């Protein structure tokens, strides 16, 4: 009998290949969750899957996906249904960040950032929130940012996308509560965190953030 036939709960984590997503996956596996790992890099996902299987003896499903692509959210949802995976906890962590003057940055890259940070998150939430509400239980955690609370020059599209995530999540949480759906919806707003997103000299270094202000994923 496979592990997915047990009473273990299952979490789906996007952006799971490194940083906050990988840390969430590790913590959840340690709490005896089976984990569905979603990100672009299949090799990194397989490495994480092997690690979690060895450490915690949980079942990991690897789903490589580029969430900036049209219909990526629907394809992800359909795969979970085809595999009979019941998602109890959804963590929308996948995100992109590009720094620089708005008019200097490539428009296609900014549109891709919106596709991942806003459109994919909205679509994935819609698909899984519906099925969770039908079951009468489930949890959704959307990763926003402290950037959601302010206008940030050189990060205007990123900050705006995270403001959307925060506002959307707060409103959806109220809807789910008012409808007695049994589904909890929460936004997490971390500060600047030492991940690969911030390691890129064109990203984190440009912000001139003192090392003492950086958070670490385990925090």
What do the predicted segments below correspond to?
Residues 101-102, 109-112:
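Substrate-binding pocket helix/loop in short-chain dehydrogenase/reductase
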Residues 174-219:
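SDR active-site lid
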Residues 42-43, 64-75, 107:
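The beta1-alpha1 cofactor-binding region of Rossmann-like NAD(H)/NADP(H)-dependent oxidoreductases
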Residues 125, 161:
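Active-site helix of classical SDR
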Residues 31-48:
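Conserved glycine-rich Rossmann-like NAD(P)H-binding loop of the short-chain dehydrogenase/reductase
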Residues 145:
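Residue(s) in the substrate-gating loop at a strand-loop-helix junction
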Residues 17-18:
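Conserved glycine-rich cofactor-binding loop
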């Amino acid at each position: 009998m496979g592990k997915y036939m047990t009473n273990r709960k299952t979490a789906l984590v996007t952006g799971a290949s490194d940083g906050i997503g990988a840390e969430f996956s590790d913590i959840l596996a340690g709490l005896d969750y089976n984990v569905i790992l979603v990100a672009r890099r299949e090799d990194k996902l397989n490495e994480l899957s092997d690690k979690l299987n060895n450490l915690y003896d949980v079942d990991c499903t690897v789903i490589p996906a580029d969430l900036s692509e049209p219909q990526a959210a629907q394809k992800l949802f359909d795969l979970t249904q085809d595999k009979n995976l019941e998602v109890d906890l959804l963590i929308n962590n996948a995100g992109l960040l590009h720094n620089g003057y708005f008019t200097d940055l490539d428009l296609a890259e900014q549109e891709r950032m919106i596709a991942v940070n806003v459109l994919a998150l909205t679509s994935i939430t819609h698909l899984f929130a519906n099925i969770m509400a039908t079951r009468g239980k489930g949890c959704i955690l959307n990763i926003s940012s402290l950037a959601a609370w302010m206008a940030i020059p050189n990060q205007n599209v990123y900050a705006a996308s995270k403001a959307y995530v925060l506002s959307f999540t707060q409103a959806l949480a109220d809807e789910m509560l008012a409808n007695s759906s049994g589904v909890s919806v929460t936004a997490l707003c971390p500060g600047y965190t030492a991940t690969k997103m911030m390691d890129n000299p064109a990203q984190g270094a440009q912000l001139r953030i003192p090392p003492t202000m950086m958070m670490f994923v385990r925090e």
